[in-house]
């Protein structure tokens, strides 16, 4: 009887731990936020890279889509090479999330521009030839895409 009670208690503890893990994941914690932090850290190391229209890498420069494509490719995710491609991007199962649920690491899309949400109403992007790649406040009303998680 004691062994059965102990086994039942262990099963209840496992179920409670699993429920807590699922609740944390639904609240934006867990692995998706950990990967989001990795995406942000990786993207931030490219601050200062020059803007080159049509560019695709940090050594020769990139445009906004080249930057986001390069960063997400590092994490094994494919993204379009043109901003217009995001109109059909709701392909591949990427999830559109409301601004109230955005998380660091989410891709941001505006007509003609993309960036990566870094948290605290900030994002990093390749802007233009005079600004290059830098982190700035979120502007306008972008679409947020959950690429990972």
Give the label of every model feature segment.
Residues 27-149:
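Peptidoglycan cell-wall recognition and remodeling modules
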Residues 1-34:
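Hydrophobic packing segments in regular secondary structure
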């Amino acid at each position: 009887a004691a062994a059965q009670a102990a086994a039942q208690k262990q099963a209840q503890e496992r179920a409670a731990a699993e429920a807590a893990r699922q609740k944390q994941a639904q609240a934006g914690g867990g692995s998706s936020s950990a990967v989001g932090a990795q995406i942000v850290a990786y993207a931030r190391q490219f601050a200062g890279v020059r803007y080159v229209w049509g560019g695709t890498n940090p050594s020769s420069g990139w445009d906004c889509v080249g930057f986001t494509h390069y960063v997400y490719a590092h994490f094994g995710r494919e993204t379009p090479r043109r901003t217009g491609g995001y109109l059909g991007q709701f392909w591949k199962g990427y999830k559109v999330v409301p601004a109230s649920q955005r998380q660091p690491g989410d891709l941001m899309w505006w007509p003609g521009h993309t960036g990566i949400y870094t948290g605290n109403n900030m994002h990093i992007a390749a802007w233009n030839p005079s600004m290059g790649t830098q982190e700035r406040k979120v502007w306008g009303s972008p679409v947020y895409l959950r690429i990972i998680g």
